[in-house]
Amino acid sequence: MGCFGSPTSKQSDVNSEDSKSQKRRSDAISRQLQKDKQLYRATHRLLLLGAGESGKSTIVKQMRILHVDGFSETEKKQKIDDIKKNIRDAILTITGAMSTLNPPVALEKKENEPRVEYIQDYASSPDFNYPPEFYEHTEELWKDKGVLQTYERSNEYQLIDCAKYFLDRVSTIKNPNYTPNEQDILRCRVLTSGIFETRFQVDKVNFHMFDVGGQRDERRKWIQCFNDVTAIIFVTACSSYNMVLREDPTQNRLRESLDLFKSIWNNRWLRTISIILFLNKQDLLAEKIKAGKSKLSEYFSEFNKYQTPSDAIMESNDDPEVIRAKYFIRDEFLRISTASGDGKHYCYPHFTCAVDTENIKRVFNDCRDIIQRMHLRQYELL
């Protein structure tokens, strides 16, 4: 009689080992799926919404500075081209508007006319390479009173918010060894197209922030982000009260923002998602109100009868008219949320300046408890 096991016994052992191996793999997959599910449920997903140029992407940059590792030297260097383009777009737009405004604006110094011709004829080229004379012409034009007067009328045409900031810094940016600082990165304007996700952690709590384009043709992409959102952060540019849309020169920007907020607030798919309202660009709003050239009442007649509310917080050095203006804009949004609120979602307003890191740090810290409560309610833990 042989001393080896039968072939049937061997096959049975192999099958048994395969079954054990398959079960181990299956158990490992199940454990991983359970971990992923727990991580997903523990993550706060924040959707940034708002009209174009409201400051959404700047908020995302602040989250990177505050809660990730900021921007590497390589990333900063990569931003130089965008910053130079901001300078070019700014001086091109301002000098181009001088003749199209009604009434038009003349240069203070006639000898600057060739500089304007250079900017309009050469700097507009798609493959423009920013030679030294470009910076020289730009610096001299930025000193011209006619150019400055045209800048002050920028609500009459389309100009990027960061125009003055970068035109003031041309002498630094033209340096071959220039590296952007954090404020340069925050101020740099690049059109957002598509959906961008930023992940960060605060006190061991995971956040995913989704930034989507705000122009009208970008908004159809928003619906892709609505699934399982913890909260919406709606960003509005308060300083846009005297401006019109790039994509529709007949529509006031702040009214567009109010209409957009109303459509989101009343959307049947979002009835259980609360909105954190960032009343942004408070610095620019204050500048405009103090200058007195574009009165809020000229664009919103309701402001004439508006009284500063009793809950307004005012410091000793605050301008009463600026306070009245910012609370008026706040209350225009709250009027929408209270008119159709059903108790299932709420609006939490905050005054923000997206380029001010300390301001955004404080505001986001104030919002974290609200977001946590929304998250617990989302998974019926509250």
UniProtKB/Swiss-Prot annotation:
Chain intervals for the UniProt region annotation (Disordered): 1-31
SMART domains to which the protein is assigned, alphabetical: G_alpha
What are the lipidation residues for N-palmitoyl glycine?
G2
A cellular component term from Gene Ontology for this protein is: plasma membrane
Positions bound to GTP? 50-58, 186-192, 211-216, 280-284, 354
Q: Name one Pfam family in it.
A: G-alpha
- For bias kind Polar residues, which ranges apply? 1-14
Q: Where is the composition biased (Basic and acidic residues)?
A: 17-31
Location of the region described as G3 motif in the Swiss-Prot/TrEMBL record? 207-216
Q: Which UniProt keyword terms apply here?
A: GTP-binding, Lipoprotein, Magnesium, Metal-binding, Nucleotide-binding, Palmitate, Transducer
Ranges for the region named G5 motif are 352-357
Disulphide-bridged cysteine pairs? none
Q: How does it assemble?
A: G proteins are composed of 3 units; alpha, beta and gamma. The alpha chain contains the guanine nucleotide binding site.
Instruction: Please give the name of this protein.
Output: Guanine nucleotide-binding protein G(s) subunit alpha
> From which organism does this entry originate?
Drosophila pseudoobscura pseudoobscura (Fruit fly)
Q: What taxonomic classification does the UniProt entry list for its organism?
A: Eukaryota, Metazoa, Ecdysozoa, Arthropoda, Hexapoda
